[in-house]
Amino acid sequence: MAQANRRSAQAWGQGSEEVNGWRQGLSEPSAPCSVHVVTAENKGFYRRGLEESFRLRHQYFSVENDFLPSQSSGRETDEYDADDAIYFLAFEDHSERLVGSVRLLPTVRKMPLKEYVDLAGGYDVPRAPTTFHFSRMVVVRDRREGKPLNFVRASLRCAVLEYCLDEDIDLLTLMMPMAMLPTFLAHGWNPVPLALPEVYRGLSIVVATVDVTEVALKLTREEAGIACNLLIKRSITRPAITTKPYPMRLS
């Protein structure tokens, strides 16, 4: 296992220094995949992984589902892929392959939901230093078994919850297909739709908030058979919340 993890660190990182960083934060051996947090502070270690995630996003959102406009570069990125974005990259432990990713964005600045006024139905969308936006969840095609909640998707959700609980983030905003609402509800995320669902590019979408709680983490782990922490934070010293908490609303 240690040898495999050393190989993975070399494959996705930049050398021996990163191998040491990887080994200090290894998930437990029973975890079939590990989820790495990537911020502006440590993204130099994950350039290949991030590039793969942008291409995976393009394949899923633009090529397979026509949910976002196709980009000639073969990469799906937007103005929110900036220094304050937080990425979660899921790698298979046995193959070192990127199998999924998701992105968190702070809500104290302009955020994607502002661009989807029709989907929000005119309701206020919460904004606060302790509220983040959950977006761009994607899983490789051959790991989408067990819909609607496959193992990689569950692993990413658990990793996001682990991170948010550590960082005192207590609420997430997101757009989700209506078909996903029951799984969030069943797993203790307490989804609260902000408006009635709307059809966007042929898919019934709802804007909602979900709570970050230990209960949600426990129930999601139980559903997916995850028995350990999956999150790996390497060379990150800065907190996610850098502003004094206070309630805000979209203007």
Language-model features, listed with the residues they occupy:
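A short helix-loop-beta-strand connector motif used in the catalytic cores of GNAT acetyltransferases and
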Residues: 78-89, 109-112
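Acyl-donor binding region in acyl/amide transferases
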Residues: 112, 117-210, 214
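Short, His- and charge-rich active-site/binding loops that engage polyanionic ligands
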Residues: 92-125
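A short beta-turn/loop motif at secondary-structure boundaries
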Residues: 77-82, 198-202
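Short amphipathic alpha-helix that is part of the acyltransferase structural core
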Residues: 25-79, 94, 98
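Charge-rich, low-complexity intrinsically disordered segments
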Residues: 136, 203-251
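Active-site beta-strand termini and strand-to-loop segments that position acidic
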Residues: 90-93, 210
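Short acidic N-proximal helix/loop "leader" segments that mark the beginning
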Residues: 1-34
